[in-house]
Amino acid sequence: MLKDTVPWNMMEQMTTKLEKWKEEDQMFVETGAAKHVLKCIKTNSCVTVTGSSGVGKTFTVRHVALQMTGDGYDILHVTNPEDIVRFSNPNKKTLFVIDDLCGTYTLNQTYLDKWKTMHEDIKGLLKNDGTKIMASCRLQVYQDEQFKLLPLFTACECNLLLQNMSLSDEEKQLIAEKYLKSDASKISQYIDLFDFFPLLCRLYYENQTLNAVDFFKNPFSVYEEEIDKLKTEKAYGKYCVLALCVMFNNHLKEEWLTEDINEDIKQIIKKHM
């Protein structure tokens, strides 16, 4: 582990964290996406893994990070840009890992400002071939216009929802067999219903009292938790848009959100407020 720039207590915490990652990694099913991310981080100094909630961004990033230890990299899990500047060591191969870069449900302006302030310093550090960054990022955060102010993190994107990166039916079946064991065959017709299939498998694995077919067909508890988190995270804009989608039966017109709307539409909205 890192000895020169990282405090001993942080080293101990990271060692414990890596042991937990290794234990959790026993449930990882090797995918084409994971192989692609590994190839990208080996040939690029900074890689951002994007996708919607539950598609396996964090799990994939951690799996690839563990593989990089085989190339002599020390792994350091950080939450802010100052840590990268503080703990970077030109004499050691270091892979910095970041979860939910710049926010979860919406782009967090405070986080963005921090990364903007340190952007050039970090860019300079990455000129050292032994220093790399791998981050996971929600797609709605990554696609925010302001995220373009961080070109380091847009230079190499691995979007787990793209056709060449998304899980194949064979990979989904292997994941189901890993987590559901004998129940995997019961849900084979539902594996393509939701992008967050990997999350559903993990949730079922953690609570096997659930009825497998009902859960994978209609995972209402997952939706409920995500909606609650939108409110908790104060993502009021997205919360309101979701409400509008429900009110208008998922038939929102773009001009209703970007232009002045007529009185009839205003009355419909007021009626449901």
Language model features by range: what are they?
Residues V78-D83, S88-T117:
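Conserved P-loop NTPase "ATPase switch" module shared by AAA+ and STAND
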Residues T117-T131:
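Substrate-engagement module of ASCE P-loop NTPases
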Residues M1-T5, N128, R138-L150, A155-E254:
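Amphipathic alpha-helical "lid/sensor" segments that cap RecA-like P-loop NTPase cores
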Residues I98-D99, G130-L139:
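Structural recognition of the conserved hydrophobic beta-strand(s) that form the central parallel beta-sheet
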Residues E82, E224-I227, C245-M273:
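C-terminal leucine-rich, beta-strand-based interaction scaffolds used for sensing/assembly
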Residues T43-V61:
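Walker A/P-loop nucleotide-binding motif
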Residues L66-L76:
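Post-Walker A helix-loop "phosphate-sensing" segment adjacent to the P-loop in P-loop NTPases
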Residues M1-H36, K42, H63:
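Charged, amphipathic alpha-helical interface modules that flank catalytic cores or transmembrane segments
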